[in-house]
């Protein structure tokens, strides 16, 4: 089981990158990707709802090859972090993902900062481990406001940046806590790189691979 981190795209809803979970089983011969970033782009007022957190998102499943081809075609970086999990933990994580993708469970209330494709990664890992991850925040996070975090991926003079500023209001200048950095996939990537499991004190990531340099 591994975490896939995708680089930024060229439209607002892809500007911050993407996160997904890959499950590969050579015995049963499947290689699939679960991601929590499915939405109806054609819904009325999509971008305003996007930043205000008024959308329903879904978890979806796709073949890895199809997933890879899509993002390779968009010339977006794809980095894979293979997780250092036991067989029991891998089975538990896969079972969690299969439960989440059931029709009655797959829809969730999207929130720009607190409930998106990136935050779901840490949530799923900690649920599987039944314990919080251990990491040194000084190696991973800076003291930055939400505005600074957003503008690291958006041109501050763009309409997208302006629209997010307006939609998020005064909150945008608050300093983000460690957990509040994790709405951005790149910070989830950094968190996992520097994390250890609480019970065994071993690195969470066994191997990091650059699958598609952009």
Spans of features found by a protein language model:
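Soluble extramembrane regions of membrane proteins in the secretory/endomembrane system
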Residues: 1-213
């Amino acid at each position: 089981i591994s975490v896939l981190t995708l680089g930024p795209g060229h439209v607002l809803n892809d500007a911050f990158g993407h996160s997904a979970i890959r499950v590969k089983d050579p015995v049963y011969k499947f290689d699939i990707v679960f991601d929590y970033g499915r939405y109806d782009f054609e819904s009325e007022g999509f971008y305003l709802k996007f930043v205000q957190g008024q959308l329903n998102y879904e978890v979806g499943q796709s073949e890895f090859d199809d997933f890879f081809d899509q993002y390779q075609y968009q010339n977006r970086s794809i980095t894979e972090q293979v997780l250092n999990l036991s067989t029991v933990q891998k089975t538990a994580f896969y079972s969690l993902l299969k439960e989440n993708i059931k029709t009655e469970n797959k829809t969730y209330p999207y929130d720009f900062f607190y409930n998106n494709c990136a935050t779901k990664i840490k949530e799923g890992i900690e649920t599987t481990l039944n314990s919080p991850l251990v990491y040194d925040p000084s190696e991973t996070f800076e003291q930055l406001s939400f505005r600074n975090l957003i503008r690291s991926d958006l041109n501050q003079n763009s309409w997208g940046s302006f629209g997010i500023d307006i939609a998020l209001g005064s909150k945008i200048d608050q300093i983000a806590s460690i957990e509040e950095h994790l709405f951005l996939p790149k910070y989830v990537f950094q968190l996992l790189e520097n994390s250890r499991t609480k019970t065994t004190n071993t690195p969470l990531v066994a191997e990091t691979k650059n699958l598609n340099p952009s």
